[in-house]
């Protein structure tokens, strides 16, 4: 299983980057004994100004061939943290590669949204794509702690 976080734009040094690195490090330490691989953070940039379509091409090229595509989109499904953990465990148990895709400031191109196996939402509000990375990294860590039976996730 490969687990990729594919995102448009590069995080500069600062609090968002620090948080993403912290949560992905925690995920790796917690997830490894559970058979979950370290997350590969793949950042793409459209330097030619081609917009969402060009970003979709770059994201598609970054993803592992045949990977389950899970996108972050405000029109997607809202899962609880335990439901997300269960989904992650199903992908792991099936040996599936997973690409979690976050679009740029304008979102994801319709053709990428249409081919997604799962569209996830952090609610009906629109979030800055840099914060979505932080939130997704935290939810990955939270999912690993749920699967490990750790007290981090309290209800």
From Swiss-Prot:
Its EC number is 2.1.1.177. InterPro entries: Alpha/beta_knot_MTases, RlmH-like, tRNA_m1G_MTases_N. NCBIfam families: PRK00103.2-2, PRK00103.2-3. Coiled coil: none annotated. Pfam families: SPOUT_MTase. It catalyses: pseudouridine(1915) in 23S rRNA + S-adenosyl-L-methionine = N(3)-methylpseudouridine(1915) in 23S rRNA + S-adenosyl-L-homocysteine + H(+). Specifically methylates the pseudouridine at position 1915 (m3Psi1915) in 23S rRNA. GO terms for molecular function: rRNA (pseudouridine-N3-)-methyltransferase activity. CDD domains: RlmH-like. Keywords: Cytoplasm, Methyltransferase, rRNA processing, S-adenosyl-L-methionine, Transferase. It is found in: Cytoplasm. GO terms for cellular component: cytoplasm. Belongs to the RNA methyltransferase RlmH family. The keyword S-adenosyl-L-methionine applies. PANTHER family: METHYLTRANSFERASE, RIBOSOMAL RNA LARGE SUBUNIT METHYLTRANSFERASE H. S-adenosyl-L-methionine binds at residues 71, 103, 122-127. It comes from the Bacteria. It comes from Cereibacter sphaeroides (strain ATCC 17025 / ATH 2.4.3). The keyword Transcription does not apply. Its main location: cytoplasm. It is an enzyme of class 2 (transferase). This is Ribosomal RNA large subunit methyltransferase H. Homodimer.
């Amino acid at each position: 299983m490969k687990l990729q976080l594919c995102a448009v734009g590069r995080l500069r040094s600062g609090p968002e980057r620090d948080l993403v690195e912290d949560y992905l490090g925690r995920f790796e330490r917690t997830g490894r004994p559970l058979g979950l691989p370290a997350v590969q953070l793949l950042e793409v940039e459209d330097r030619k100004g081609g917009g969402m379509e060009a970003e979709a091409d770059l994201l598609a090229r970054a993803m592992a061939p045949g990977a389950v595509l899970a996108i972050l989109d405000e029109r997607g499904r809202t899962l609880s943290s335990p439901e997300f953990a269960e989904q992650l465990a199903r992908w792991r148990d099936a040996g599936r590669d997973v690409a979690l895709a976050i679009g740029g400031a304008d979102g994801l191109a319709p053709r990428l949204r249409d081919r997604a196996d799962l569209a996830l939402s952090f609610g009906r509000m629109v979030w800055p794509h840099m914060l979505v990375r932080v939130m997704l990294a935290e939810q990955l860590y939270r999912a690993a702690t749920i699967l490990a039976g750790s007290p981090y996730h309290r209800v």
